[in-house]
Amino acid sequence: MGNNVVVLGTQWGDEGKGKIVDLLTERAKYVVRYQGGHNAGHTLVINGEKTVLHLIPSGILRENVTSIIGNGVVLSPSALMKEMKELEDRGIPVRERLLLSEACPLILDYHVALDNAREKARGAKAIGTTGRGIGPAYEDKVARRGLRVGDLFDKETFAEKLKEVMEYHNFQLVNYYKVEAVDYQKVLDDTMAVADILTSMVVDVSDLLDQARQRGDFVMFEGAQGTLLDIDHGTYPYVTSSNTTAGGVATGSGLGPRYVDYVLGILKAYSTRVGAGPFPTELFDETGEFLCKQGNEYGATTGRRRRTGWLDTVAVRRAVQLNSLSGFCLTKLDVLDGLKEVKLCVAYRMPDGREVTTTPLAADDWKGVEPIYETMPGWSESTFGVKDRSGLPQAALNYIKRIEELTGVPIDIISTGPDRTETMILRDPFDA
């Protein structure tokens, strides 16, 4: 039996993690975010009602679940307050269900200003960040000048630290990027206005998780973004600024690494990517447009159109290696309904003619990579909302089986629609 279950994306994000976390939290006592910030966009559809969460864990809608934001998350006070208000306006008692690590780095206005100034300065070489200050906040953390939630307990010292760090960043903004300085007093006033709310939710997360482990409580760890955007293992520099792989659970929450019992990789039935960076199977034809339209591939956070393409099992195998995956949840299978044929990328042809079955490491090494496809028959029958494996067309079952063969990982859950009920659980991670 797995008490500590990790749910993470195996591609470039947007795989459908939020729905699956929400579904599986029916049995969980805690749901923990361990990396990223409000650059994530987790969409839940429950009884036809749509909820988009960016920072708060997806378990917040469950009455008997405690949601935790771990130390690996960079926390924007303004984004958190906005999200809390939206949920509280719908009658959800967020403050009774949400806890924070005091070690969460804060994202403040100057981080956002830096993020946007840098992207503008990069011009055609822009990374495609969400412009929410995520990267600069992580930079401050590593440089040991970042302000954290715990600093809000001493307001006088916080004001002094803020003044010092803002002098440093405003110098860059004005003299290097040639943009306006960020107003110190406004940042201080805005942060102080919510300081007591934030500190009232602080808890020792590592100790709480260890106590939960000793009691045998079920805990779900909710990943954001996707494996191929990992700061160390992704398509650098076109990556996010945190560790999106399973290793980030231990460092981003304080759970001992030996206590991770099951890692569920969320795998979209095709590939998508937002922003710049390598994408060997990207489609620029009517099939790519079909996938975008049928899959409603627009970012929950930015509204940007996602790039679309065939499923890349070479890249997914890298995710299997990096995360020691226990099983997959295959999402958006229904988007492929109606295609005469479906393709799986099984290898790459490098510019020198070599065929390889592993991904390059740096973004520059992906240049000129051509996908080698295996083509399979598609299916005309609808898989939307199918809740039993026997109800799937044979061609869809063949597609599923081939993914399992190419990756060496079983598909334990199949999602056939956005609602939590439109799901087949073949093996429950908490029972594995």
UniProtKB/Swiss-Prot annotation:
KW DNA damage (keyword) present: no
Gene Ontology annotations for the cellular component aspect, listed alphabetically: cytoplasm
GO molecular function terms listed in the Swiss-Prot or TrEMBL record: adenylosuccinate synthase activity; GTP binding; magnesium ion binding
Disulphide bonds in the chain: none
Record key words, sorted: Cytoplasm, GTP-binding, Ligase, Magnesium, Metal-binding, Nucleotide-binding, Purine biosynthesis
Pathway: Purine metabolism; AMP biosynthesis via de novo pathway; AMP from IMP: step 1/2
HAMAP family, alphabetized: Adenylosucc_synth
Species per Swiss-Prot/TrEMBL record: Salmonella schwarzengrund (strain CVM19633)
Residue sites binding GTP per the record: 13-19, 41-43, 306, 332-334, 415-417
Protein name listed in UniProt: Adenylosuccinate synthetase
Cofactor requirements of the protein: Mg(2+)
Family according to the record: Belongs to the adenylosuccinate synthetase family.
Active site (catalytic residues): 14, 42
Subunit-structure text: Homodimer.
UniProt xrefs under PROSITE patterns: ADENYLOSUCCIN_SYN_1, ADENYLOSUCCIN_SYN_2
Organism classification: Bacteria, Pseudomonadati, Pseudomonadota, Gammaproteobacteria, Enterobacterales
Annotated positions binding substrate: 300-306
